[in-house]
Amino acid sequence: AGANRDISKVIQSLPGVGGTVSFRNDLIVRGGGPSENRFYLEGIEIPNINHFSTQGASGGPVGILNVDFIKSADYYSSAFPSGRGNALSSVFDFKLIEGNKDKPSVRASVGASEISLSLNTPVTENSSLLFSVRRSYLQFLFSQIGLPFLPTFNDATTRYKVKLNKKNELSFLFIGAYDQFKLNFDAEQTE
C-alpha cells in the first residue's frame, strides 16, 4: 500500500533502508549514499532502476521495472554474494516471473502517472515471451494546470526464453527507458 506500483517505494519499507524527500526513490541503506547500491535483473547489473535519475544518486520519481513481472527481490545489506561485489551499501537481485506456457495473458492499466500494456504469452511449445511498455501522461496534466515543466517517460521490458532441453535454456532480456523534459512556454510566470 502506498507504493504506487513502484518497487523502490516497497524497498524503502525494509529494515535499515531509508529514503530522501517523498518525490524521489533514492535508497539510503544503513547510512550509505544513494549511489552505493547495486541492482541486478536476472543476474545482469542495471545501473539504475528509476526514471529521471540524477548523477550520484540511484533514485528518481518513478521506477523503470514493471512490478507485474517481478517474481522475487533478494536484498543484501551485508555479506554480498561473491558475484555481486562493488557495492558499498546494498545489493538487490530481482527475478522475473516465468512466461505463460498455456495461453496468452494481456494486461492494460492506468496508473497515477502512466499507462501500460503487458503481454505474457507462449511463443512455441518450448518458449515464452514477456513484454511490457509504459508511457507517462504527466506532460498533459502538467500542461493543463500550468506547470513550467512537462516530464515524459517511457520504458519497455522484454524477455524471450526458450527451453533447449531439460537442463538448458536460453534467455534474451531487454530493458530500456527514455526520459525527456520540455519547458512549458505557455505557463504563466510566477513572481
Q: What are the residue ranges of the model-derived segments?
A:
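Outer-membrane beta-barrel proteins
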Residues: P15, P61, F80, S105-R107, ...
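A short, compositionally biased micro-patch
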Residues: T20-S22, G32, A87, G111, ...
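Transmembrane beta-barrel outer-membrane domains
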Residues: S22, A87, K101, A108-A112, ...
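Transmembrane beta-strand segments of Gram-negative outer membrane beta-barrel proteins
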Residues: D68-Y75, S82, A87-V91, K95-V110, ...
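Transmembrane beta-barrel wall of Gram-negative outer-membrane proteins
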Residues: R107, G111-R135, L147-Q180
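Short gly/pro/ser/thr-enriched loop/turn and capping motifs at secondary-structure boundaries
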Residues: Y137-F140
